[in-house]
Every structure is written in C-alpha cells, then in structure tokens.
C-alpha cells in the first residue's frame, strides 16, 4: 500500500510542474505560464517502483531527475503514472495533466455545411454535425497549420490529413443519407488518427474521388488510438482498406459497410478488443480480405462477408497469425470467389452459428456440418 503522506511531495511536484510548464513531467508541455525563479538541488535522487529502479524519460529520451526545492522533493509525473500503472498525458488547451482516464467533458456541438467549416471545427471535445452533402478535404488550403494536433502530411500525389492526440470527437451526418467526406490524392488516407481517444463516426460515408483500382491509401487509419465507435456508416474504395489499425484498442463497428476496396476490407496489427456487429464487407478485390496480426479479442457477430474476389493466386479470405480470441459468430460468408480458405491453418477461430453459401473456395473447408 502506498503511504499517502509520501505522496504529498509527488502531488506537489505535479502541481508545480503544471504551473511552471517545465519538462519534469516526462511528457511534452506547451504552455505560456507566469515565470518564477527558484533554487533547486539535484542530488542524484533515485526512484524505485516496487523494488525496481525507475528512470523516467522525457519526450526526447533524456533522463528526467527528481529535484529538491525549499525542502520539498519534486518527482516526474511519469514516475507517478508508473506507480499506479496508468497512462499520463498533457492537454495544452485545458492546461491539465491526466493520469489514467480523462474526465468526461461535454462536447461542444457545431453544425457545419461545407468543408471549410468542418475543418475549422475539428478538435477535442467536439460534436460536429454535418449537413447533407459532399465534403472534399482536398479543396482546403493545405499549408502550414498552427494547430499542432491537426496538420497535413505530404504523400506522393497530395496531402493527407492527420488528427493527432484528439480526444472526444464525434462526426455525425445529418439527414436520411450519410454525409460524404472524400479526398482526391490516391496515396492519402481519408482520415488518419494518431494517439486519439474516444472518436465517433455516425452516418458518415468516406472514400476517394478517383476511379476504382487506382488507390494506394486507405479510408480510416488508426494508430495508437482507443475507444473508436463507427456506426451507420459506409467506407468505400478505391481505398486500399476500409480500416487500417495498428496498436489500437476498443473499436466498435456497428450497422456499417465496407465495400469496393482494392486490397481488402481491413488490416490490423497489435490490436485488441474490436467488435464488428450487423455489418457488411462486400465487393472488395483483395489480396487477403481480412488481415489480423498479433491481435486479440476480435469479434464479428451477425456480419455478412459477400461478393469479394481474390485477384492474386493463393490469397486467403482470412489471414490470421499470432492472434487469439478471433470469432465469427452468426455470420454469413456468401458468393466469395477464388480465395483460399483452409480451416487447418486457422484452427483457433470460432465460427459458431456461421454459414457458408455459394463460395468458390480453394483448400479445405470442413466446419463439422
């Protein structure tokens, strides 16, 4: 048990570093607070966590040392986060340090009718409602952005929009049909989310403007993100994949469609706790339709996988490796063509209640019927 009295210096250090905006946090802090000159003593103070020496690092890998000022020992927040086993983050907009889960903050509602308004509204704690229409991100001015969390990355034939460390953002299309968000560069993803949390897309259609078969970018790309909710939406090709995910957790995909993508429906690596429910993955021309690598607890329930076609010999409709907890329950595989489907190389997948009809699979297909 941690002695609360011993934590007083920790918490004092937390508040101290927040006010002064110094790098003892072990995270990047961008702030313009008031300045106070103080005397500090560095005395090679060591931090042990559960008997193990801990050396908190800064954003550039440098060691962050505790120090003493006026008899109080100030300790990096990174050390506190390690003690409690919680992530630590800094929000420059609210000038807040978060250890573990961030508090729920009511999102600001904004209604937009064109792509300029959409771009201006993007950010944390926003619920953006899109009026019916097409929002072409490539129509935006794409120069230098002073917003460090929203910026453009140059690709081979244009720019790609990056949302970095965005929290609690909802994009919701208004009307009976989804609001459509598109990009023109074939090497750009429509949206790339990096280190984002609590992202929601509702009634959104997203894809590329150019002809099918010409893309090298995907639709939605999630990197080191969590708590993603996609519902009543359509992700379409020519994008390479509808969903690209790496080191991402807790993604929910409900009542939605991925269609006509050129490399497959989705690819994921080092991910966990994904749930696809009441959704359709169809008409993709694929190398491997669904790629799952080094991931766990990926569940498809009441989904339809239909009319997909392999364009390379020895292509697998499911490419699963170094993964566990993969389930296709109550799903339908139908009218898929020329894929390999050998249950012997994917023996740990649960196909309870799943049916197969009208497929032309190569390889062994024996589900104990």
Which sequence ranges carry the predicted segments?
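Extracellular beta-strand-rich solenoid/capping regions of secreted or surface-exposed proteins
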Residues: 120-124, 136-172, 181-203, 207-226, ...
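Short aromatic/basic micro-patch
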Residues: 74, 111, 200
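Extracellular beta-strand solenoid repeats
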Residues: 129, 136, 162, 170-172, ...
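Right-handed parallel beta-helix/beta-solenoid
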Residues: 102-120, 134-135
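Primary recognition of N-terminal secretory signal peptides and signal-anchoring hydrophobic helices
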Residues: 2-106
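Short glycine/acidic-rich loop motifs that flank beta-strands on beta-rich extracellular proteins
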Residues: 139-140, 182-190, 209-218, 239-246, ...
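Right-handed parallel beta-helix
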Residues: 168, 172-177, 197-208, 226-237, ...
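Surface-exposed or flexible loop/turn and strand-edge residues in extracellular/cell-surface modules
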Residues: 35, 42-44, 94, 107, ...
């Amino acid at each position: 048990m941690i002695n609360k009295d011993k934590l007083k210096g920790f918490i004092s250090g937390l508040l101290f570093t927040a006010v002064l905006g110094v790098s003892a946090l072990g995270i990047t802090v961008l702030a313009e607070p008031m300045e106070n000159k103080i005397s500090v003593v560095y005395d090679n103070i060591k931090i042990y966590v559960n008997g193990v020496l801990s050396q908190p690092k800064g954003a550039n890998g440098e060691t962050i040392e505790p120090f003493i000022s006026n008899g109080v020992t100030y300790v990096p927040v990174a050390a506190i986060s390690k003690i409690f086993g919680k992530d630590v983050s800094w929000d420059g907009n609210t000038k807040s340090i978060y250890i573990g889960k961030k508090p729920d903050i009511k999102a600001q509602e904004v209604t937009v009718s064109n792509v300029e308004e959409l771009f201006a509204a993007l950010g944390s704690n926003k619920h953006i409602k899109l009026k019916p229409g097409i929002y072409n991100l490539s129509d935006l001015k794409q120069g230098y952005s002073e917003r460090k969390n929203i910026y453009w990355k140059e690709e081979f034939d244009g720019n790609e929009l990056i949302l970095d460390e965005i929290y609690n953002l909802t994009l919701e299309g208004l009307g009976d049909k989804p609001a459509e968000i598109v990009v023109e560069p074939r090497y750009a993803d429509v949206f790339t989310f990096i280190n984002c949390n609590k992202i929601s897309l509702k009634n959104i259609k997203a894809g590329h403007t150019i002809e099918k078969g010409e893309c090298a970018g995907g639709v939605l790309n999630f990197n080191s993100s969590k708590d993603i909710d996609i519902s009543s939406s359509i992700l379409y090709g020519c994008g390479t994949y509808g969903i690209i995910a790496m080191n991402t957790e807790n993604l929910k995909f409900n009542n939605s469609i991925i269609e006509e993508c050129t490399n497959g429906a989705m690819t994921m690596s080092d991910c966990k706790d994904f749930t696809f429910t009441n959704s359709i993955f169809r008409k993709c021309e694929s190398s491997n339709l669904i790629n799952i690598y080094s991931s766990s607890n990926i569940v498809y329930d009441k989904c339809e996988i239909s009319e997909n076609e392999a364009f390379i010999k020895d292509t697998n409709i499911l490419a699963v490796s170094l993964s566990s907890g993969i389930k296709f329950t109550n799903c339908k595989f139908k009218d898929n063509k020329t894929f390999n489907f050998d249950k012997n190389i994917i023996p740990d997948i649960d196909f309870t209640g799943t049916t197969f009809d009208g497929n032309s699979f190569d390889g062994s297909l024996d589900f104990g019927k």
